Amino acid sequence: MSATVRILGIDPGSRVTGFGIIDVRGRDHFYVASGCIKTPADEPLFTADRIAVIVRHIGEVVAVYKPQQAAVEQVFVNVNPASTLMLGQARGAALAALVSHKLPVSFTEYTALQVKQAVVGKGKAAKEQVQHMVVQMLGLSGTPQADAADGLAVALTHALRNHGLAAFTKLNPSGMQVKRGRFQ
């Protein structure tokens, strides 16, 4: 019997940070939890209060669900430098929470393109396509919010990259084939 590995995926955001937790056991994968951390709308972007909310809530998620591994979506460089800086602060807050709870992150990060490629098979996939594939891959009865689905997609990407495609043989609900590590 294979050991269960619990993975936390985080999609950092200045207003909403999404998270998703999955378990990988041998050839099976299971949904554990997901959600969105919303920072106070009445606070200016980006204040210590917003950072504190992200750190506190990610810390609570880690304390409750006890993941063994974590991965974070990498911040992209935006046309607007202020937006990039705010996303970087949200990412830093999430990483600080993980490190403060002694979670071995190894700073595993994936670009949005890598996440979409791993989950949907197309790096330019729309958010709705990511949500749809997360529902299919995890056998969910409902559709998670977009940011929570992104967190789950980050966790799935980490599982695919680090626990092998063999762990995800049942990910193929539509008869797609895996070629060069991608669904075709």
From Swiss-Prot:
Organism of this sequence: Neisseria gonorrhoeae (strain ATCC 700825 / FA 1090)
Catalytic reaction list: Endonucleolytic cleavage at a junction such as a reciprocal single-stranded crossover between two homologous DNA duplexes (Holliday junction)
EC top class named in words: hydrolase
Function: The RuvA-RuvB-RuvC complex processes Holliday junction (HJ) DNA during genetic recombination and DNA repair. Endonuclease that resolves HJ intermediates. Cleaves cruciform DNA by making single-stranded nicks across the HJ at symmetrical positions within the homologous arms, yielding a 5'-phosphate and a 3'-hydroxyl group; requires a central core of homology in the junction. The consensus cleavage sequence is 5'-(A/T)TT(C/G)-3'. Cleavage occurs on the 3'-side of the TT dinucleotide at the point of strand exchange.
Cofactor binding, per record: Binds 2 Mg(2+) ion per subunit.
Primary site of residence: cytoplasm
GO cellular component: cytoplasm; Holliday junction resolvase complex
Protein residues bound to Mg(2+) 2: 73
Molecular functions (GO terms): crossover junction DNA endonuclease activity; DNA binding; magnesium ion binding
Cofactor(s) the record lists: Mg(2+)
Domain of life: Bacteria
Entry annotation: catalytic residues: 11, 73, 147
InterPro entries per record: RNaseH-like_sf, RNaseH_sf, X-over_junc_endoDNase_Mg_BS, X-over_junc_endoDNase_RuvC
HAMAP family per the UniProt record, alphabetical: RuvC
One GO biological process term: DNA repair
Protein name, entry field: Crossover junction endodeoxyribonuclease RuvC
PROSITE patterns: RUVC (PS01321)
Keyword annotations of the record: Cytoplasm, DNA damage, DNA recombination, DNA repair, DNA-binding, Endonuclease, Hydrolase, Magnesium, Metal-binding, Nuclease
Family membership noted in the UniProt record: Belongs to the RuvC family.
PANTHER family given in the database record: CROSSOVER JUNCTION ENDODEOXYRIBONUCLEASE RUVC (PTHR30194:SF3)
Binding site for Mg(2+) 1: 11, 147
A Pfam cross-reference name: RuvC
